[in-house]
Amino acid sequence: MAVLPAQQHGLLVLNKPQGPTSAQCIARVKRLGQKKIGHAGTLDPMARGVLLVLLGHATKISGHLMADGEKVYLGTLRLGTTTDTWDAEGSVTATAPYDHVTPDDIRREVENWLGSTEQEVPPYSAAKHQGQPLYKLSRAGRETPVKTKTVEISRAQVVSCDLPSATFRVTCSSGTYIRSLAHSLGMRLGCGAMLTELTREYSHPFGIDEAHELDAVLAEPERLPERVIPVTRALPHWPKLRISAAQEAGVRNGMIVPYLPEAMAELPFAEGLKAIMLAPDDTPVALAETRIVNAQPVWTVLRGLWSQ
């Protein structure tokens, strides 16, 4: 029996297979001695692709990772069929002819996704109403309220079109429902549509070329440490602030650190700047933010990256 690795602290970029839920994938990795584990951005069971698994201290950066994160998806939709989940996993609720739709219609509608838009949240989703996930209300046969959210689509293009199917690629903000894009396209074209395939190709700042297959990770637990990426690479746009050993000890006890421009490559002070504090040996110590305290510019700790 292979020796399980110690608790890791960093990110594992996983290529989630089609079938299991994100939670099931996390549970399998957890069996490799990883008691403290989470992820940034759920994928539906039918979807595959980049799933960012957070290990140890990296679980504390989840909110920042998801807030900063642009995502790229490759999806395929099929015209003429509508389901209750808006994808191929659900039960068919309606069918309609689609022979009036042309490839140019598809391209036009996909281009219309661009920009900031309000999209309807799928009735089968983890979004909550009065504390209950919508999917639980839907499965119980209860009426689900129509919820909308604002999303940003920065790129959208048709990759191929072989009606009734069309494959597209979108670059979007975190939290975008690709099922909703397919569903709304079908509604606008008057024939309905469902999502049949979905691959997340990129979840900022990692692409699928850096992702590890789940089966390989599980089969070789001894290689987990070499597959884990440091926290500093997860937030590439955050400056690195190296502090002294004395400051590190103080930070762990709630002390603030003076803002010194020379420590930040002469970056001028502004409130709300964020950085990753590093110990003298480059170990991540904390996520920090600039503030004015007692009329002085300082760094304060957003989240400590040490064991509590």
Curated annotation (Swiss-Prot):
Presence of keyword Metal-binding: no
Residue ranges the record marks as coiled coil: none
A Pfam short name: TruB_N
Active site residues per record: D44 (nucleophile)
Reaction(s) catalysed (UniProt annotation): uridine(55) in tRNA = pseudouridine(55) in tRNA
MF terms (GO), sorted A to Z: RNA binding; tRNA pseudouridine(55) synthase activity
Keyword Cytoplasm: no
Function according to Swiss-Prot or TrEMBL: Responsible for synthesis of pseudouridine from uracil-55 in the psi GC loop of transfer RNAs.
Family named by the database record: Belongs to the pseudouridine synthase TruB family. Type 1 subfamily.
Protein name as annotated: tRNA pseudouridine synthase B
Organism, as annotated: Nitratidesulfovibrio vulgaris (strain DSM 19637 / Miyazaki F) (Desulfovibrio vulgaris)
Gene: truB
